Amino acid sequence: VGLIFAILSRTSLGNVQIFESKEHDSTNQDNRALALSNGSRLILEEIRVWDRLEKKITKIKKIHTSQAGSFGRTMLDTEEFNEESLGYIISYGDLMGALQEEVECIRNVKISYETKVTKCMDEKPSLNLTLQTKNKTKKFKSEFVVLADGSTEGIEGLELNKKIKHFNHAAIVTKVLSEIPHRNIAYERFTSNGPIALLPNKEDKFSLVWTGPLKFIEDLKKLNDECFLSQLHESFGDRVGSFEECEKRISFDLKQTHVEVMHSNIVALGNASQTMHPVAGQGLNTGFKDAYKLSQSLRDDLNTKNLETLINDYKQSRVSERKKILGFTELLVKSFSNDLVGFKKARGYALTLLDISRPIKQSFVRKMSYGE
């Protein structure tokens, strides 16, 4: 998200300096799957990065949603909505590589790798940063700072109001090979232990995201591959046949965070601003939109407003939209991770209504694809 903002702002700002704590090539082999919406694709097209990614992405042509042990299912299909795709799967390493290549072509944008910001002192009109590299400590002065892509913990001088909501759930992610090829279909299966998402990913494998109660996910991670795949098949059903192999499993706790920056000349974007449950797949795409909206404000209003006013206006404009996205995600979590009497039946009716009502389908797809 930070790289996207820098590329988008290359003509609005003078010199842009990016500080990255990791090594230059540290993300190249990172195969974590990212789900990009059509709105994010448009942003990547605008910054001339999409062409580099087209041969590396996997298109989602259909989305099949159902729940275990009850009626109700829906199928979303690109042919219904005149869309090339309902979303795209790309590896984190491929996305970062393409963004880094583009940044290295821009004269006024520079990246310093293996450089950690340890202090950010607000001494108006400037911000004074303390940087730690491998060999020494440096100072850097700026009138405007963007926090993006990562934790802000441990940066002295930052005043943040952070709200955290714990779901008492975790996620386990891996790649799995199924008996039946994915055919560019993504699956969302709601079970009594939490949602299972299977996302088509390159060589006929699926990227799996399985969320559920902490203890359940912990137990899944302890299983050997054969038992894990058997449990997955039992929970997911037969739509893609049996599961034949899986890669290394990674798990992490799920929480929703919202960070309010208390400085008038500092903005947080991406997961430095908010994190959310993966059930709706909106976390990264919201970060893309944050970066786009802020760069748009700089481009359109920097000549008529002072920087402090512009930043405040941007923050206010994003408050209501962020609340809607976080609220929508939380609603999905509560609605589809609840097995109380009546909920399963209500979910079945909701999925059936979504499947048979074209206007509701269109509205849902617009929201998930473009955030509208």
Residue ranges and their predicted role:
Residues G2-L3:
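N-terminal Rossmann-fold NAD(P) dinucleotide-binding loop
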Residues L8-R32:
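Glycine-rich FAD pyrophosphate-binding loop
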Residues S37-R41, Y92-M96, Q100, H169, ...:
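A general structural signal for well-ordered alpha-helical segments in protein cores
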Residues L42-E46, R52, K56-L158, K165-A171:
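Conserved N-terminal helical subregion
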Residues T137-K139, F144-G241, E245, R249:
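Conserved FAD-binding catalytic core of PHBH/FMO-like flavoproteins
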Residues F216-T304:
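FAD/FMN-dependent oxidoreductases across multiple families
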Residues Q296-E372:
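C-terminal helical "tail/cap" subdomain of flavin- and related membrane-associated enzymes
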